[in-house]
Amino acid sequence: FGLGCAAKWTGIYAGAGLAVLYLGVLWARRQQGRPGFWAEFRLAALGGVLFYVVLPLCIYVASYLPYWWRQPDFSLGDWWRCQLSMYSYHATLKATHPFESRWYTWLLGLRPVWYYRNGSLPYGMKASIAGMAGPVIWVVGLAALMGLFWHQVSGRGSRQGAAVLILYGTQLIPWMLVTRCTFLYHYFPSSMFCLAALALMLARMRHRDWARRLCAGLCAAAAVLFAVYYPALSGLPIPAWWADALEVLPSFGFY
């Protein structure tokens, strides 16, 4: 958690999901009515503060050690002003970008982020780099998430399914409230739970022949699509006809 926040503040969203799971486990134990719960709760609360607040904060502050090494007079006040400056930048950002996208387009990966184009290639060749969705994992995973949600609300859910939904939601829901310029890559942390949801749903059906065939088919489709789109992920030069064929939606536009 501390390392995640040190890399990017959106790691706080993951911390919120962990906190919900932590409190949920404590609540479940309280509902069991076992003796000695409050002693266990006090120990768990102390551990939660220590390992979810104090230790991550220390790790976050320690990530600024290069500042102190380079500039010995760098103070905690300077550190705090860095935090205020970063917050102010993101809170007041008014810039726009041709490849920005809203959160609801991320669910199906409708608007990739274009990073690079090589304009010095021979005629008939193209090279580009874009950040985009893995269509099998994202699209089928979204369906699996909806299936998990239905199982939970219909009383047939599991703790694993609830955990996946909570962690997915705490990564995505905050972005629904953001009005500034956002991009597809903000959904990447949430997309990991699409894969987890897909794994859970397939595990439920593992004893059915058609489910095993479906699993094999999805793996094969994901591998084929990765190979087909690898040039757009890596900048590998390819013939123009191949590049043009990769832009299956008007919103892609990365060649």
Regions found by a protein language model. Name each.
Residues 113-161:
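Membrane-interface anchor segments at the N-terminal boundary of transmembrane helices
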Residues 13, 182-203:
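Hydrophobic/aromatic-rich transmembrane helices and adjacent perimembrane loops
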Residues 176-188, 232-237:
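Membrane-interface catalytic loops of GT-C/OST-like multi-pass glycosylation enzymes that act
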Residues 1-9, 19, 172:
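Membrane-interface alpha helices of multi-pass inner-membrane proteins
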Residues 29-47, 144-165:
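Membrane-interface helix-loop-helix junctions at transmembrane boundaries of multi-pass membrane enzymes
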Residues 28, 45-110, 114-116, 228, ...:
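Membrane-lumen/periplasm interface segments of specific transmembrane helices
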Residues 15-26, 189-192:
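Hydrophobic transmembrane alpha-helices of multi-pass, membrane-embedded glycosylation machinery
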Residues 20-21, 26-27, 34-52, 56, ...:
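Transmembrane helical bundles and short interhelical boundary loops of multi-pass, membrane-embedded
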